[in-house]
């Protein structure tokens, strides 16, 4: 079955369709990871996006029940050079094509993904639509140009109701802006008691749970659209230790008076080098974001930059000068990706311990 990708600049890529036969539109982005496609396509941060994978062969080890980052993928499409029809791995339970059909996600294979990636790098992120060949291309282009960027992605992927995960250790409130499952697992591995709450939870509701710390999760979209999160974080500063990841990092920055801006084509992949400014040490990190904190906006804030991207110098980590709070733009939980930054969860545990000790001695 032939299928095409139409971009808002008029570019057309014709290839073979797989997965669902739905017509879907969204922001077309690219991911440079070589493995981890199951975790990637189930990452809620990709809500509403059509994802191009730059590695040429995808699907060769199949899909299993353990590697999902959410059970209901929110991506609007998947584009690959070649989709493997016959996966081979002892953990495999179904093919990529089978999963996409079940989750109603359209796929496109057999196109020049390198050309598409170069196009996005040159012109910036573009809106696109996956559709059959018998459509009016010019009409689709005009519709894409006229379609506003959604502002409700976080509400689509955040938990509807709070829930509790018992544990003998530190009590953590995990604010779900589109949380990856492995963030919760990292807290559970450290024996934390976790309360997962929706994105619109107020600071008063958080404090009522008596947390030792608050973790602000990853999520999709423009951080400026999540005003509830900014207000909540602002009202929590100084009252409880904070740790922000990805979107949570951006919301933390906004709450402290900084600004964010959209990147030309974003950072998406499991091979992004990050430098810690104080030591010069390099970590290879998993990343998935289209926005960044503007360094010039930090001048009149109490924030300092702790980490920066090696490739383009953008901010990858922040810490508060006064309060026990820090954040990173990348994903220390990996999944998929390297575990160089996994120690940040241990740092969060130590921050909660030291803050509690300080409170007892005051």
UniProtKB/Swiss-Prot annotation:
<dbReference type="GO" id="GO:0006541">
    <property type="term" value="P:glutamine metabolic process"/>
</dbReference>
<dbReference type="GO" id="GO:0006526">
    <property type="term" value="P:L-arginine biosynthetic process"/>
</dbReference>
<keyword id="KW-0315">Glutamine amidotransferase</keyword>
<keyword id="KW-0665">Pyrimidine biosynthesis</keyword>
<dbReference type="GO" id="GO:0004359">
    <property type="term" value="F:glutaminase activity"/>
</dbReference>
<feature type="binding site">
    <location>
        <position position="250"/>
    </location>
    <ligand>
        <name>L-glutamine</name>
    </ligand>
</feature>
<protein>
    <recommendedName>
        <fullName>Carbamoyl phosphate synthase pyrimidine-specific small chain</fullName>
        <ecNumber>6.3.5.5</ecNumber>
    </recommendedName>
</protein>
<comment type="similarity">
    <text>Belongs to the CarA family.</text>
</comment>
<keyword id="KW-0067">ATP-binding</keyword>
<comment type="pathway">
    <text>Pyrimidine metabolism; UMP biosynthesis via de novo pathway; (S)-dihydroorotate from bicarbonate: step 1/3.</text>
</comment>
<dbReference type="GO" id="GO:0004088">
    <property type="term" value="F:carbamoyl-phosphate synthase (glutamine-hydrolyzing) activity"/>
</dbReference>
<feature type="active site">
    <location>
        <position position="333"/>
    </location>
</feature>
<dbReference type="Pfam" id="PF00117">
    <property type="entry name" value="GATase"/>
</dbReference>
<feature type="binding site">
    <location>
        <position position="290"/>
    </location>
    <ligand>
        <name>L-glutamine</name>
    </ligand>
</feature>
<dbReference type="InterPro" id="IPR029062">
    <property type="entry name" value="Class_I_gatase-like"/>
</dbReference>
<dbReference type="InterPro" id="IPR017926">
    <property type="entry name" value="GATASE"/>
</dbReference>
<feature type="domain" description="Glutamine amidotransferase type-1">
    <location>
        <begin position="171"/>
        <end position="358"/>
    </location>
</feature>
<feature type="binding site">
    <location>
        <position position="288"/>
    </location>
    <ligand>
        <name>L-glutamine</name>
    </ligand>
</feature>
<dbReference type="Pfam" id="PF00988">
    <property type="entry name" value="CPSase_sm_chain"/>
</dbReference>
<feature type="binding site">
    <location>
        <position position="45"/>
    </location>
    <ligand>
        <name>L-glutamine</name>
    </ligand>
</feature>
<dbReference type="GO" id="GO:0044205">
    <property type="term" value="P:'de novo' UMP biosynthetic process"/>
</dbReference>
<feature type="binding site">
    <location>
        <position position="219"/>
    </location>
    <ligand>
        <name>L-glutamine</name>
    </ligand>
</feature>
<comment type="subunit">
    <text>Composed of two chains; the small (or glutamine) chain promotes the hydrolysis of glutamine to ammonia, which is used by the large (or ammonia) chain to synthesize carbamoyl phosphate. Tetramer of heterodimers (alpha,beta)4.</text>
</comment>
<feature type="active site">
    <location>
        <position position="331"/>
    </location>
</feature>
<feature type="region of interest" description="CPSase">
    <location>
        <begin position="1"/>
        <end position="168"/>
    </location>
</feature>
<dbReference type="InterPro" id="IPR036480">
    <property type="entry name" value="CarbP_synth_ssu_N_sf"/>
</dbReference>
<comment type="function">
    <text>Small subunit of the glutamine-dependent carbamoyl phosphate synthetase (CPSase). CPSase catalyzes the formation of carbamoyl phosphate from the ammonia moiety of glutamine, carbonate, and phosphate donated by ATP, constituting the first step of the biosynthetic pathway leading to pyrimidine nucleotides. The small subunit (glutamine amidotransferase) binds and cleaves glutamine to supply the large subunit with the substrate ammonia.</text>
</comment>
<keyword id="KW-0547">Nucleotide-binding</keyword>
<keyword id="KW-0436">Ligase</keyword>
<dbReference type="InterPro" id="IPR002474">
    <property type="entry name" value="CarbamoylP_synth_ssu_N"/>
</dbReference>
<dbReference type="GO" id="GO:0006207">
    <property type="term" value="P:'de novo' pyrimidine nucleobase biosynthetic process"/>
</dbReference>
<dbReference type="InterPro" id="IPR050472">
    <property type="entry name" value="Anth_synth/Amidotransfase"/>
</dbReference>
<feature type="binding site">
    <location>
        <position position="221"/>
    </location>
    <ligand>
        <name>L-glutamine</name>
    </ligand>
</feature>
<dbReference type="InterPro" id="IPR035686">
    <property type="entry name" value="CPSase_GATase1"/>
</dbReference>
<feature type="active site" description="Nucleophile">
    <location>
        <position position="246"/>
    </location>
</feature>
<dbReference type="InterPro" id="IPR006274">
    <property type="entry name" value="CarbamoylP_synth_ssu"/>
</dbReference>
<feature type="binding site">
    <location>
        <position position="247"/>
    </location>
    <ligand>
        <name>L-glutamine</name>
    </ligand>
</feature>
<dbReference type="GO" id="GO:0005524">
    <property type="term" value="F:ATP binding"/>
</dbReference>
<feature type="binding site">
    <location>
        <position position="291"/>
    </location>
    <ligand>
        <name>L-glutamine</name>
    </ligand>
</feature>
């Amino acid at each position: 079955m032939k299928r095409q990708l139409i971009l808002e600049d008029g570019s057309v890529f014709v290839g073979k369709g797989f997965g669902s036969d739905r017509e879907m539109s969204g922001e077309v982005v690219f991911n440079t990871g070589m493995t981890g496609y199951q975790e990637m396509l189930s990452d809620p941060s990709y809500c509403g996006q059509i994802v191009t994978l730059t590695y040429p062969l995808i699907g060769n080890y199949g899909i299993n029940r353990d590697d999902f980052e959410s059970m209901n993928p929110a991506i609007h499409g998947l584009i690959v050079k070649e989709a493997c029809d016959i996966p081979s791995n002892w953990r495999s339970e179904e093919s990529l094509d089978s999963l996409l059909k079940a989750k109603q996600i359209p796929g496109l294979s057999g196109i020049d993904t390198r050309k598409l990636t170069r196009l996005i790098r040159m012109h910036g992120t573009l809106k696109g639509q996956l559709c059959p060949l018998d459509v009016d291309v010019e009409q689709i282009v005009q519709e894409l140009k006229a379609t506003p960027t959604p502002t409700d992605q976080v509400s689509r992927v955040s938990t509807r109701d709070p829930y509790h995960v018992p544990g003998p250790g530190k009590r953590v409130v995990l604010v779900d802006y589109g949380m990856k499952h492995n963030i919760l697992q990292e807290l559970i591995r450290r024996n934390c008691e976790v309360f997962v709450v929706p994105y619109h939870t107020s600071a008063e509701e958080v404090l009522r749970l008596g947390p030792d710390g608050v973790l602000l999760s990853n999520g999709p979209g423009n951080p400026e659209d999540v005003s509830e999160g900014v207000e909540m974080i602002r009202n929590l500063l100084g009252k409880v230790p904070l740790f922000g990841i990805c979107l949570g990092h951006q919301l933390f920055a906004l709450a402290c008076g900084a600004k964010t801006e959209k990147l030309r084509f974003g950072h998406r992949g499991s091979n992004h080098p990050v430098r810690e400014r104080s030591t010069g040490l390099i970590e290879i990190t998993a990343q998935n974001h289209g926005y960044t904190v503007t360094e010039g906006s930090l001048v009149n804030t109490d924030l300092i930059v702790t980490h920066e991207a090696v490739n383009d110098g953008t901010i990858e980590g922040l810490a508060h000068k006064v309060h026990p709070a820090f954040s990173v733009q990348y994903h220390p939980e990996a999944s998929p990706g390297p575990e160089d930054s996994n120690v940040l969860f241990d740092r969060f545990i130590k921050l909660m311990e030291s803050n509690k000790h300080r409170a007892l001695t005051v």
